[in-house]
C-alpha cells in the first residue's frame, strides 16, 4: 500500500479488481467540527504504473485532490488523502493491514511547525499506530452533523489537550536525544571518512574523475530531454520508490505511461457510505511472486527490520555504490525514467553525503506498533517548500530506492537461509548430539568431583578426629608421667619471699638418696684413709727381712696387735700419767695383706662414686626433662590454642613445643598436605607502646620476608603466613623432630671433636648460602638453641632456624664489605656476639658477626663451656665489658684438640673484624678436608722436608771431601 502523509487526515484505498477502478473517500469520524474545519486537500491515485508525483486539484467541497500513481501491481486502488489540522493532539487514520481489503485505524503524532510539516510514506508509517483490524465505515463528510454530546466533546478536548502537552514534551525529549545521537554518529562518520580519504586518496580521486566524465556526457543529452523532464517530478521520492522499486516490477507497457493531464476531482458527498468486508485473495487474483510488494516479504508482529537496521543497510549500499560505480544505474530498473539518472550528481560534497544517511525506520504492520520520525527526517522535510510538498529532499530519491531494495534483499536472504536450514539439519542434529554427550560427561565429572570432594572432606574429618584422640592420649600420658615423677625428681613449689611469691624448685626423694649415698662413700673413704695412715706407722723396720723375736712376744703382738708398753709401772703416779704406747710392729706378711685390703676398698669406693655420679647425671637429665615438661604443660594449659583449634581450616594445633618471650611454637598438622608443621605464633602485647608494637611487627615481617625467600637443606623452610586476630599472627614452618643443640649440651656438657666438626660444617654450608645471595643475609642470632638436631643427637643432620633478628645487606656488592648500620643493638645473646656489636654508637656490621658466633659454638661443643663470660649473666657481661675485653682466646689442656680445630677457632675469634675470616674462607679451611687428604698432605710435606735435608747433607759431604783432597 502506498500512502502520503500530509498535515491532517489520511485515508488509504483498498485494492481494485480487474481493469475497473473505483475512487472513494475514507472518512474518519470527526469530533471537532464547526468553525475549526478547514479545506481538506485530497490526493487521488489512479492506480496506473507511472512513477509520477501526485497531482493536486480542487474538489467541490474545497478539498485539494491529487492523483497518484502507485505502480502496475494490480492490488492498489484509488487513494484520496484528506488533510486537516482540526483534530488536535491525537488524529486517527486508516491503514491497510496484511489483508488487502482490511483497513487499520492508525494514530498519528501531532503536527509540527504549525501544521506545515510533511512526511514521507515511510516516515508516516513510523508516526502511526494501529488501533484495530476492523474495517471503518465509508461515509460522506458533513460538517453539520454532530456525533458526540457537547459534554463528552468537552471532556474529549480536555483529554486531547493534556495528551497533546504530554506528547509534545515526550517528543521534544526524544528529538533531543536523537539529535545528540545523530551528531555523535555524524562525527564518527566524518572521522572514518577522513581516515578513508587519507588512506585511499589516489583511488578516491580516480573514482571521482569517472563520474565527472559521465556527467559531461549526460549534459550533452540534457537539452533534448528537458521538455520531458519538466513534466515529471522527482521520481526518487518515497511514494514512487514504495510503488515500483520495492516491488521490483519490470515495465510491461513499453515504458512509463503518460501522466493524466487533468486531476480527477472527487467530493465527499458523491460517495456513499459503505463498509469494506474482510475477504482473502482468491487463487485467480493472487499476486505472482515477482509482483509482490515489499510489505508482503515482511513479517507481521514486530519481526521486521528496525530503523537502525535500515540505516545500516543504507550505509552499506552507499559504500558499495562508492566502491563500484557500475551498480549505480541499477536503481532505474523498476519503472524509472531517464530523469532520475540525469538528476544524479557524479560527486557529492561532504554535507550532502552526510545528509543522505538520515535515519529511516521500517514501517511495521503489526498491531500497536508506533514509529517516531527521527530528528533528521523532520529536519529535511521541514526545510522544503510547499510547492515541492510531494517530492523527497534532494539527493534522497535513489537512497530510498536503495533502502527498499536492501530490505527486499535481506528478507529474500532470510528466506533462502530458512530454506537452507533443512539441508543442514543432519549436521545440526549431530552437533546437538555431541553437545549433549559433552554435557552428560561434564555432569558425570561434576558428580564424581563432588563425590571425591565429599570423600576428601570425610577423610579430613576422620584424620582430624584421630589426631585429636591421639593427642589427648599423649597429653594424658605426659600428665600422668609428670605427676608420677614429681615426687621422685622434684617439682615447683610456691614460696613467699618478702611481699612477693615465686616458684621455687624442690628436689625429690631420688636426689635425697643420692646425697645419702654420697655421704656414705665419703665416710668410708675417710675411714680407709685413716686406716692406711695407721698401717704405715706399724710398718716393719726391715722390709724383706724377718726379725728375731721371742715366741711369747710374737704371740702377744698377734693377739693384741700392739707392742707392749715400755713404761709399765705399778706405781699410782705412773697410772695417772701414762705414756702412750708405741705402735707395735707387725709382721711383714700382715702389713702386705692390710695394705692390699685398703687399696681394694679405695678402688671399690672410687667405682661406687663413679656410678653414683653417673646416676646423678642421669637424674639431672631427667630433672631437665621434667622441669621442661612442667613448664611446657603449664604454658600449654594457659594458652588460648590448647583446644585443638583449626587455623584457617587447615592447620590443626596439637601440642605446644616451646614458648619464648613474645611467641610460642606449636606442633600442628596440615590436613591439606598431610604433614606435620610447626606454627610459630607471634603475640603483640596490648599494653605495649605503639613504638614497641611497631618495632616488634617490623622484625616479625622482616623475618617472614627473609625466611620465605630461603630454600636450603640446612635451613628450616617457611610454608605460610596467616593472621589470627588483631594482636597475633602465625608463621607456618617446617617441623623438625628432636631437640636443639643447647638442650643436648646441657645433658652431655660436651661432645667429641668429630661430632662438633660435623655440626659446624653444616652450619658453615648454610651461611655460605646466605652470603651467596645478591643481597647477603646476616643471621645475627646464631646460637646452640637455634640449631635443631633432626635425630635428637649429634650424629644426624641439623637445620638453622629463628631469623627474627636477621639483617639484609642491601646496596651494591662493593658496599657489603663496609657493612650496614646496627639498628638493634644489645639484642640477641651476648655470649655469641662479637666485640664490635657492643661499641657505642652502633657501628657497621658485616657477615663476620656470624663467623664469631661459629667460633664460640665450636669452642663450647668441644670444651663444654663458653670461651668468654661462661659463668656470668648477660647483665654482668655488660657491666664488666667482658666481650669488649676478649682480645685473645685460650685453650684448656684437656681434652686434647687437634691443631686444625684450634686454628679454626682462632680464625673465628679474632678481635678485629678485619682480621677475622669470612664464611668463604671457613668453608675452605683444612678442618673440613677429608681425613685421607689431610694425611696425604702431611705425608707430602714430610717427604719434602726429608728431600731437602738429604740435599743439604749431600752438599756438606761434597765440601768435606774436597777439603780433604
UniProtKB/Swiss-Prot annotation:
<keyword id="KW-0217">Developmental protein</keyword>
<dbReference type="InterPro" id="IPR008271">
    <property type="entry name" value="Ser/Thr_kinase_AS"/>
</dbReference>
<feature type="region of interest" description="Disordered">
    <location>
        <begin position="35"/>
        <end position="72"/>
    </location>
</feature>
<feature type="active site" description="Proton acceptor">
    <location>
        <position position="781"/>
    </location>
</feature>
<comment type="subunit">
    <text>Interacts with air-2.</text>
</comment>
<dbReference type="GO" id="GO:0005634">
    <property type="term" value="C:nucleus"/>
</dbReference>
<comment type="similarity">
    <text>Belongs to the protein kinase superfamily. Ser/Thr protein kinase family.</text>
</comment>
<feature type="modified residue" description="Phosphoserine">
    <location>
        <position position="634"/>
    </location>
</feature>
<keyword id="KW-0418">Kinase</keyword>
<feature type="region of interest" description="Disordered">
    <location>
        <begin position="1"/>
        <end position="22"/>
    </location>
</feature>
<dbReference type="InterPro" id="IPR000719">
    <property type="entry name" value="Prot_kinase_dom"/>
</dbReference>
<feature type="binding site">
    <location>
        <begin position="657"/>
        <end position="665"/>
    </location>
    <ligand>
        <name>ATP</name>
    </ligand>
</feature>
<keyword id="KW-0804">Transcription</keyword>
<feature type="compositionally biased region" description="Gly residues">
    <location>
        <begin position="10"/>
        <end position="21"/>
    </location>
</feature>
<keyword id="KW-0597">Phosphoprotein</keyword>
<keyword id="KW-0723">Serine/threonine-protein kinase</keyword>
<keyword id="KW-0805">Transcription regulation</keyword>
<feature type="region of interest" description="Disordered">
    <location>
        <begin position="95"/>
        <end position="120"/>
    </location>
</feature>
<keyword id="KW-0539">Nucleus</keyword>
<protein>
    <recommendedName>
        <fullName>Serine/threonine-protein kinase tousled-like 1</fullName>
        <ecNumber>2.7.11.1</ecNumber>
    </recommendedName>
</protein>
<feature type="compositionally biased region" description="Polar residues">
    <location>
        <begin position="552"/>
        <end position="572"/>
    </location>
</feature>
<dbReference type="GO" id="GO:0035556">
    <property type="term" value="P:intracellular signal transduction"/>
</dbReference>
<dbReference type="GO" id="GO:0106310">
    <property type="term" value="F:protein serine kinase activity"/>
</dbReference>
<dbReference type="GO" id="GO:0006357">
    <property type="term" value="P:regulation of transcription by RNA polymerase II"/>
</dbReference>
<feature type="compositionally biased region" description="Polar residues">
    <location>
        <begin position="233"/>
        <end position="244"/>
    </location>
</feature>
<feature type="binding site">
    <location>
        <position position="680"/>
    </location>
    <ligand>
        <name>ATP</name>
    </ligand>
</feature>
<keyword id="KW-0547">Nucleotide-binding</keyword>
<feature type="region of interest" description="Disordered">
    <location>
        <begin position="538"/>
        <end position="576"/>
    </location>
</feature>
<comment type="function">
    <text>Essential for appropriate transcription during embryonic development. May act during transcription elongation to activate the RNA polymerase II large subunit (ama-1) by phosphorylating the Ser-2 residues of the C-terminal domain 7-residue repeats. Does not phosphorylate histone H3.</text>
</comment>
<keyword id="KW-0067">ATP-binding</keyword>
<feature type="compositionally biased region" description="Low complexity">
    <location>
        <begin position="382"/>
        <end position="401"/>
    </location>
</feature>
<feature type="region of interest" description="Disordered">
    <location>
        <begin position="172"/>
        <end position="292"/>
    </location>
</feature>
<dbReference type="GO" id="GO:0007059">
    <property type="term" value="P:chromosome segregation"/>
</dbReference>
<dbReference type="Pfam" id="PF00069">
    <property type="entry name" value="Pkinase"/>
</dbReference>
<feature type="region of interest" description="Disordered">
    <location>
        <begin position="320"/>
        <end position="402"/>
    </location>
</feature>
<dbReference type="InterPro" id="IPR017441">
    <property type="entry name" value="Protein_kinase_ATP_BS"/>
</dbReference>
<feature type="compositionally biased region" description="Polar residues">
    <location>
        <begin position="320"/>
        <end position="341"/>
    </location>
</feature>
<dbReference type="GO" id="GO:0000785">
    <property type="term" value="C:chromatin"/>
</dbReference>
<dbReference type="GO" id="GO:0004674">
    <property type="term" value="F:protein serine/threonine kinase activity"/>
</dbReference>
<feature type="domain" description="Protein kinase">
    <location>
        <begin position="651"/>
        <end position="928"/>
    </location>
</feature>
<dbReference type="InterPro" id="IPR011009">
    <property type="entry name" value="Kinase-like_dom_sf"/>
</dbReference>
<feature type="compositionally biased region" description="Low complexity">
    <location>
        <begin position="342"/>
        <end position="355"/>
    </location>
</feature>
Amino acid at each position: 500500500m502506498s500512502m502520503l502523509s500530509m498535515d491532517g487526515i489520511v485515508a488509504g484505498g483498498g485494492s481494485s479488481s480487474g481493469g475497473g477502478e473505483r475512487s472513494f473517500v475514507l472518512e474518519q469520524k470527526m469530533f471537532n467540527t464547526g468553525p475549526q474545519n478547514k479545506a481538506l486537500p485530497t490526493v487521488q491515485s489512479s492506480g496506473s504504473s507511472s512513477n509520477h508525483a501526485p497531482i493536486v486539484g480542487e474538489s467541490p467541497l474545497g478539498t485539494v485532490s491529487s492523483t497518484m500513481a502507485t505502480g502496475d501491481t494490480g492490488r492498489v486502488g484509488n487513494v484520496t488523502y484528506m488533510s486537516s489540522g482540526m483534530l488536535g493532539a491525537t488524529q486517527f487514520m486508516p491503514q491497510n493491514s496484511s489483508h488487502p481489503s482490511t483497513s487499520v485505524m492508525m494514530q498519528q503524532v501531532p503536527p509540527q511547525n504549525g501544521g506545515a510539516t510533511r512526511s514521507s510514506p515511510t516516515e508516516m508509517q513510523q508516526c502511526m499506530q494501529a488501533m484495530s483490524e476492523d474495517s471503518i465505515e465509508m461515509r460522506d463528510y458533513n460538517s453539520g452533523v454532530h456525533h458526540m454530546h457537547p459534554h463528552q466533546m468537552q471532556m474529549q478536548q480536555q483529554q486531547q489537550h493534556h495528551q497533546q502537552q504530554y506528547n509534545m514534551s515526550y517528543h521534544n525529549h526524544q528529538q533531543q536525544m536523537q539529535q545528540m545521537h545523530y551528531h555523535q554518529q555524524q562525527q564518527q562518520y566524518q572521522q572514518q571518512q577522513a581516515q578513508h580519504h587519507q588512506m585511499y586518496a589516489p583511488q578516491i580521486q580516480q573514482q571521482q574523475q569517472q563520474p565527472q566524465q559521465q556527467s559531461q556526457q549526460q549534459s550533452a543529452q540534457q537539452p533534448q530531454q528537458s521538455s520531458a523532464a519538466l513534466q515529471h517530478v522527482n521520481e526518487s521520492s518515497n511514494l514512487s520508490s514504495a510503488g515500483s522499486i520495492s516491488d521490483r516490477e519490470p515495465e510491461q507497457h513499453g515504458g512509463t505511461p503518460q501522466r493524466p493531464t487533468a486531476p480527477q476531482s472527487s467530493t465527499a458527498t458523491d460517495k456513499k457510505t459503505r463498509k469494506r468486508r474482510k475477504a482473502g485473495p482468491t487463487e485467480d487474483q493472487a499476486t505472482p511472486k515477482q509482483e509482490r510488494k515489499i510489505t508482503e516479504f515482511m513479517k507481521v508482529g514486530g519481526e521486521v527490520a528496525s530503523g537502525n537496521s535500515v540505516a545500516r543497510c543504507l550505509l552499506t549500499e552507499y559504500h558499495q555504490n562508492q566502491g563500484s560505480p557500475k551498480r549505480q544505474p541499477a536503481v532505474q530498473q523498476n519503472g524509472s525514467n531517464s530523469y532520475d539518472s540525469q538528476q544524479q550528481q557524479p560527486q557529492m560534497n561532504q554535507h550532502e553525503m552526510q545528509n543522505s544517511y538520515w535515519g529511516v525506520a521500517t514501517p511495521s504492520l503489526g498491531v500497536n506498533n508506533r514509529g517516531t520520525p527521527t530528528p533528521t527526517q523532520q529536519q529535511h522535510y521541514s526545510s522544503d517548500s510547499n510547492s515541492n510538498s510531494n517530492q523527497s529532499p534532494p539527493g534522497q530519491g535513489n537512497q530510498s530506492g536503495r533502502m527498499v531494495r536492501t530490505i527486499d534483499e535481506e528478507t529474500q536472504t532470510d528466506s533462502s537461509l530458512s530454506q537452507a536450514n533443512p539441508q543442514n539439519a543432519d549436521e545440526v542434529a549431530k552437533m546437538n548430539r555431541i553437545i549433549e554427550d559433552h554435557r552428560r560427561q561434564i555432569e558425570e565429572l561434576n558428580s564424581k568431583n563432588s563425590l571425591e570432594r565429599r570423600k576428601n572432606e570425610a577423610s579430613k574429618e576422620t584424620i582430624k578426629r584421630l589426631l585429636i584422640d591421639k593427642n589427648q592420649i599423649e597429653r594424658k600420658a605426659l600428665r600422668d608421667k609428670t605427676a608420677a615423677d614429681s615426687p621422685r625428681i622434684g617439682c615447683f613449689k610456691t614460696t613467699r619471699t618478702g611481699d612477693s611469691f615465686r616458684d621455687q624448685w624442690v628436689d625429690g626423694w631420688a636426689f635425697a638418696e643420692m646425697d645419702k649415698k654420697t655421704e656414705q662413700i665419703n665416710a668410708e673413704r675417710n675411714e680407709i684413709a685413716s686406716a692406711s695412715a695407721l698401717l704405715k706407722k706399724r710398718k716393719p723396720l726391715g722390709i724383706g727381712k724377718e726379725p728375731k723375736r721371742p715366741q711369747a712376744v710374737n704371740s702377744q703382738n698377734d693377739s693384741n696387735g700392739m707392742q707392749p708398753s715400755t713404761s709399765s709401772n705399778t706405781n699410782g703416779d705412773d697410772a695417772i700419767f701414762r705414756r702412750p704406747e708405741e705402735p707395735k710392729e707387725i709382721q711383714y706378711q700382715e702389713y702386705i695383706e692390710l695394705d692390699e685390703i685398703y687399696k681394694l676398698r679405695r678402688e671399690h669406693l672410687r667405682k661406687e662414686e663413679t656410678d653414683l655420679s653417673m646416676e646423678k647425671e642421669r637424674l639431672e637429665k631427667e630433672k631437665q626433662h621434667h622441669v621442661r615438661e612442667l613448664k611446657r604443660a603449664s604454658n600449654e594449659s594457659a594458652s588460648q590454642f590448647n583446644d585443638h583449634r583449626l587455623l584457617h581450616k587447615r592447620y590443626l594445633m596439637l601440642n605446644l613445643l616451646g614458648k619464648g618471650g613474645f611467641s610460642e611454637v606449636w606442633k600442628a598438622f596440615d590436613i591439606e598436605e598431610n604433614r606435620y608443621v610447626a606454627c610459630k605464633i607471634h603475640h603483640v602485647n596490648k599494653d605495649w607502646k605503639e613504638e614497641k608494637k611497631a618495632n616488634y611487627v617490623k622484625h616479625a615481617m622482616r623475618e617472614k620476608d627473609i625466611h620465605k625467600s630461603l630454600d636450603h637443606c640446612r635451613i628450616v623452610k617457611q610454608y605460610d603466613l596467616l593472621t589470627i586476630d588483631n594482636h597475633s599472627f602465625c608463621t607456618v614452618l617446617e617441623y623438625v623432630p628432636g631437640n636443639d643443640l643447647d638442650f643436648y649440651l646441657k645433658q652431655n656438657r660436651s661432645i667429641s671433636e668429630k661430632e662438633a666438626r660435623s655440626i659446624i660444617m653444616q652450619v658453615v654450608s648454610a651461611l655460605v648460602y646466605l652470603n651467596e645471595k645478591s643481597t647477603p643475609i646476616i643471621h645475627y642470632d646464631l646460637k646452640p638453641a637455634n640449631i635443631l638436631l633432626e635425630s635428637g643427637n649429634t650424629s644426624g643432620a641439623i637445620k638453622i632456624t629463628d631469623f627474627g633478628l636477621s639483617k639484609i645487606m642491601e646496596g651494591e656488592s662493593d658496599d657489603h664489605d663496609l657493612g650496614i648500620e646496627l639498628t638493634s643493638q644489645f639484642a640477641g645473646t651476648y655470649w655469641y656476639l662479637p666485640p664490635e656489636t657492643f661499641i657505642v654508637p652502633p657501628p657497621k656490621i658485616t657477615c663476620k658477626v656470624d663467623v664469631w658466633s661459629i667460633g664460640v659454638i665450636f669452642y663450647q661443643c668441644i670444651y663444654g663451656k663458653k670461651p668468654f663470660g661462661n659463668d656470668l649473666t648477660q647483665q654482668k657481661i655488660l657491666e664488666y665489658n667482658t666481650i669488649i675485653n676478649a682480645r685473645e682466646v685460650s685453650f684448656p689442656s684437656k681434652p686434647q684438640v687437634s691443631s686444625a680445630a684450634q686454628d679454626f677457632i682462632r680464625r673465628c675469634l679474632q678481635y678485629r673484624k678485619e682480621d677475622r675470616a669470612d664464611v668463604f674462607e671457613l668453608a675452605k679451611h683444612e678442618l673440613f678436608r677429608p681425613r685421607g687428604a689431610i694425611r696425604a698432605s702431611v705425608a707430602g710435606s714430610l717427604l719434602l722436608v726429608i728431600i731437602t735435608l738429604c740435599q743439604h747433607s749431600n752438599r756438606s759431604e761434597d765440601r768435606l771431601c774436597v777439603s780433604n783432597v
